[in-house]
Every structure is written in C-alpha cells, then in structure tokens.
C-alpha cells in the first residue's frame, strides 16, 4: 500500500491538530465543576463519564497523521492511569500545553534537541521540589479528603474509602463491585478468606445460614488429592482424642475418603469439614504455605518427603474460628507466630517490587492482604446501569489516588502544586535549553487554568493570584470560587499522581517536538457498492409454466 510522507513543520502541525482534538474532549472533565462526556458504544446504551482516560481511550480520528498524535497522548493518559491510577486529565492537558508552547518556539527556529534537554532538566528539578513539599498522610480525615477530590468532590465516596482503608490497613486489598441496590455498601472480611467452599453440604453446622462454623479447630494442610481413607486414619484418631473440630484443606478429597468423613460427621464421631486448596499450580503451593504460616501449621507435602500417614497434631495449624459457606472459607485469628507472619509479608512485598507482570502483582497483593489485615469490598449503588458505571469509575480513581497519597504523600491540590514547584526552581541554563525550561514552566499553569475555566472563572486572573511566591499553601477553590489555604480546605493531591502526570506528559511532548517526518498509509476511498439491478418483471414468471 502507498505511504504518505510529511516533513518538518507540516508533520508537527498535523500531529498537533490531533493532540488538540483529543485534549479538547478530555479537558472539559477537569476539576470539581468539570462536565460530563457522552460516549457512543458499538452496542448497548451510551456511557457517560468524567474520567479522562475513559474519554481518551474512545477517541480515534479519521486523519491518520492526526490520529498518530492523538494516539501518543492517549498513551500518556493510559500510562499515567496504570502507574498512578489517577491524573490522566492532568497528564493530557500538560502534554498539549507543552507541545503547543514548544511548537511555537521550534517553528521560530529553536533547536528541538536542545529544547528537549532543557525540558528534561527542568522536570527533574520540579519533581524534586514536589517531593520536598510533600506532606505525609496521617489519619482518616486526610485519606477522605484525597479520595473526595479524586471522586469529583463526592464526599460520600471519600468517607467510604477512608473507612475501608482504616479497617484493612494500607497493605489491605480494597475491591470495587456493583451493588444490587441504589445504596453504597462497605463489607470487610476479617482474617484470611479464600474462594473455596465446603466439599459436601452434609458438613453444614448452621442450617439457617447454610454455613460450617468451627470453633478452635485443628487445620490439616495437604498438597495432593486424598482418595484413600487409610492414609487419614492415624491423624483422625489423634483428633478424636482431643475432641476438637478439624478442617482439611487439600487439592481434593473424593471417593471413599469423602464418603467416610461425611458418615463420621453425621454420626457425631468427628466434627469435621473439608475444602479444596485455593489457587492452581505453584500459586496453590504458595497459598497453602501462607495458610500454614498464618495458623502455625505445616503443609504435608510428598515433595518434602512427608506422607499423610506421618502427620501428627504438631503438624496441624490452629485458629480461633473457621467459617465456610458454599463459595468461601474464612480463617479468623490463626495461631501462627507473629515473627514468621511478618517475615512472610516482607517476602511477598519483595516479590511485588520485583515482578513486572500486572497479573502476578495483583495476585501477590491479594496474598499480602490476606496475611496482613483483610479485604474490604466497596459495593457501588446507583439508580441506573449508566450511572453505576460512571460512579464505579470515580470510585476506582479515588481508590488509586488514595493509595498513591499514602505511598508518597500529598501536596496542595487544584493545580497549584505544579505552579509553586516550578516557581521555586532556579536553574542556570542558556540558549535553547533555557527556552525548553521556560516552555514547561509556562505549561505548568495549564491544569489550574483549565480547572478555573471549567468552573466559569477568568483563568488568567486565577493563575496570577495563585502564582504568589511567599504563600506555599495558597490556592483556588473552584467549587466555591474562593482563594483558600488548600490544606485547611482539604483540597490536596497525591505527589505520585502529580509527578507521574508531569513526567509522562513531558516525555511524549518532547517526542512530538523532535519529530521531523511522519510516514502513514494513504487511505483509499473504496468505491460505493453498485446498486442492485432492477428486478422488475420477475412477478410475471408464473407465465413460464
């Protein structure tokens, strides 16, 4: 297929046109008074959102060069979302502002490579200024403030996330699901829960709740299938003498072994229950080891030269309580050694830091939560499915922003932190490097200007007022139209979100500015389908008989 090659200013201007179109659609969502964007779906009802990355992902432009420009900035939004979980609109607005300012200077004759070098040096300095201005997040109130800002000033979402984080801790897992009613709910699972239910309903002890409830049980962990009762008999005899309940966690229990356990349970000989081990393959072995450490037991594994027949009471784990329903097993207050649990937690944290797979990271995070505190489930309710999806997007954003705030701290929000950090930077640069630094410095005003504009205020006046050098916490509250102490007003942003948004925006804008040629396919207009031939006279075919 033939290719179209465009050079220099023509190429950059076409790329800028695409970036501008994407930015114009995304920027309207910014700030507490940002507007909604309605997105047509290929099937089903249209979706409505105030989430920048959701808007960016839907944009495909007809012109191939424009689409390449938009695609690069779309990548900025997605990458910022992946790394920080929020700040996608900020990243898009910054990338557009830097590209726009840079394009003007490069068209006037500045050297793109020198300009890029100056931009990189300035961003590095701004990033360190942001980190030095960061304030550690302490307590439920600040967590609620961060979550509220990220959820487009919805305080009910902020309070819900703060409560969830207070209950499960910063290492706990918080998941977001759709509720079956119009109300938001928070469910917290104490202890370790895994998604395996009882192997037989005959194990149920609480018929009203359809649950197995075991008080102070022994826990037997085995990493293979149990099919033969003979292997289990020695440990069952020891359990019977203690009079305590027993939970068996194994790859599977079937045939004669399961039938005999059920009969013994029904006759009252043993208070016993059995579940399958969670996970698959190597992950199953790791999770069994987690349960063993949490409960102070050992995994009976043939790989370690142990057989089920050799198991004794010393190999069994213990817990205050175990609750099993048809889908889940929950172990509460395992009797494991605190130092061993802490060592296991640190080991999993190290694995999280090393892994490059998002899936592995998510699974390791779940294991960490189960060992260190628990899991909270936020159920988002709304009157319609469209509203629920929009609200769920905001809850996800708020949750990610909160985690980022706990990780690296917070700075003043509303776009003020970037301006103040830029004003504090003092680099001795010359020539085109200085131009590069000035481009980024001017672009740092773009998020604040957009927030003010969306709220119906004069962007220039607001930017000049907030820019003062000797008022580090001073900023503009777009929701009320007042100038306030941002920390006192609870208008705060996570440093991680601001930092990653800026770094990604400069990265892609500098690539666009140093682009000297574009190569793209020439779209050929396919001829329209010819009209169907006139079928008149077909009705008279009956006369052929």
Swiss-Prot record:
Binding residues for ATP: 29-32, 50, 86-90, 414, 477-479, 493
Disulfide-bonded cysteines: none
GO molecular function: ATP binding; ATP-dependent protein folding chaperone; isomerase activity; unfolded protein binding
Keywords, sorted A to Z: ATP-binding, Chaperone, Cytoplasm, Isomerase, Nucleotide-binding
One Pfam family in the UniProt entry: Cpn60_TCP1
InterPro entries associated with the record: Chaperonin_Cpn60_CS (IPR018370), Cpn60/GroEL (IPR001844), Cpn60/GroEL/TCP-1 (IPR002423), GroEL-like_apical_dom_sf (IPR027409), GROEL-like_equatorial_sf (IPR027413), TCP-1-like_intermed_sf (IPR027410)
Biological processes per GO annotation: protein refolding
NCBIfam families in the record: GroEL (TIGR02348), PRK00013.1 (NF000592), PRK12849.1 (NF009487), PRK12850.1 (NF009488), PRK12851.1 (NF009489)
Protein family per UniProt: Belongs to the chaperonin (HSP60) family.
Quaternary assembly: Forms a cylinder of 14 subunits composed of two heptameric rings stacked back-to-back. Interacts with the co-chaperonin GroES.
Protein name: Chaperonin GroEL
